[in-house]
Amino acid sequence: MQSANDLKQLLFGINHKSYPAYKSTRGAYQFPRYTLSIDHVQGDPFAAPSRVSVHINGKTAAFPTSLYDTYEKRVALQDYLLRQFARAIAPYSFRAKGSGKSGLLGVSRCGQEILERTACVLNPSDGSLIVNMEIGFPANGRTIASQELIRILFDFLPGCVEKSLLYRSLDPKACAGVARLCEDQQAIRAALKEKGLTAFIADGSILPRETGVSDLPMKHAVPFVSPESLRVTLYLPNRGSISGMGIPLGVTLIVGGGFHGKSTLLQALERGVYNHIAGDGREYVITDASAVKLRSEDSRSISNVDISLFIHDLPGKSDTTSFSTADASGSTSQAANVIEGIEAGTSLFLIDEDTSATNFMVRDELMQRVVADSEEPITPFISRVRDLYEKLGISSILVAGSSGSYFHVADTVIQMKEYVPYDITERAKTTAAEFPPFTASVRPFAVPSFQRRPQPSKALTGSDRTKVKVMGRESILINKSLTDLRAVEQLTDSEQLNGLAALLLDAAERRMDGRKTLVQVVDLLERQMDEKGLASLLAPGRPGDLARPRRQEIFECLDRCRELKF
């Protein structure tokens, strides 16, 4: 391995040369506290920045093993260190001068959720640390300005590493606080099963967000207060006792007037599948980790999904036990989303009537009289929601503001009034008894066997050079194959889409042979991430910073890839 001084001399030697001479810097260099690896050099100052990684051995990093002795605590510590490093380098970005992206210093931007990322990886076996970052190698026009890169690598970066990535430079109480919060969050997750709950929202939580485009907590928002009848007290290993609203297993209905906080509560529950950072307001909003948000999704593709539980006898005699379409309607898409969610192993569905297909959710009595059940191919969700829970153990939390039919099938009814929840189950049931319940002739409840087998796809693997493009949190483009993920609302970060793109390619290249079922393919992908780490999916020419998606989002991505056939 070359020394830091070797790198400095090399940079002096290529100053004022044409930009491609920067390629000669690729390699690893030993600095006093770390090894600097120049992994990829950009082609010109206007291209995507160069990729650089900082490697710190465990003895130098010196983080106590108690901070990362479980997977969840390790992810939380990695997240904390990444945020500290991002703050440390921010004042130096673009301080070095030049053309295009010269002087840029960048690292993954973490949101409010704590995610496993390839940008910061702590090895649990020896405590060593790797941080991946971007640096815009400076130039004037397309002429190397290596004296500016020397400033970055020798003046700016060492101090940033020293103060943000070494335990001795960090606040030990803050580091311990990250681990303690994680332990408490995991304790709540364990308590959900023990106490028969689908979710827990702590008293004092701040659920509203700052704006529609900001995930920061809203200032001066009304703190959450549990209704007494639903209040649960849990005992956490660090915080001690904590009280809040426990949502029981079964069918829960959230009602209330417009703008009173129904959807805000549901959105907090959607994100409760992730742990949140301290100060977010949702640190102690914990939802069943397998929860899936359901919605209608006009125009999505569906491949060989048995939706006969909800859709049957379509015009043209389409076989709904093996339904495929390139242009799904609202009701067929939502039916497929339910079945695919079951296949993905969910224990909880989250549904907002505002984003659902009305004819999929319920039919009123007048419509039943005008259009007979025998002429209606849709079995509405209200006719299956009890069976989903009683026969499959899948609970549902639904937001409703227009139809009262679900009062008859709900176990718990929560009314949001001026952002405060009230348990109105008894009153709602008493009132509902004065009205006839929804009834319809439905077919027996039968769950598909889930034997779909993804076929090999030349559209994903057929070219010599696979081109991958990720468009924010919206879609993945592999060669000419577009996977639209806009309706997968529990994806929170563009790097999760980078991860999904890498998983999709890995599955296409190594897993999908027409013999393995979709469940088996996803099992293999998860096993690889568990055993070899998320970074094992990294490959040249593909998105560089990955965040790990949940099992449910892996299924949702594969199900929405138009080029995949089952």
Put a short name on every predicted segment.
Residues M1-G196, L207, F566:
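N-terminal accessory targeting/assembly segments
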Residues E390-G393, V399-F566:
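Conserved NTP phosphate-binding and transfer environment spanning the P-loop NTPase/kinase superfamily
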Residues K193-A199, D203, F259, L266-E297, ...:
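Carboxylate/His-rich catalytic cores and anion/metal-binding grooves
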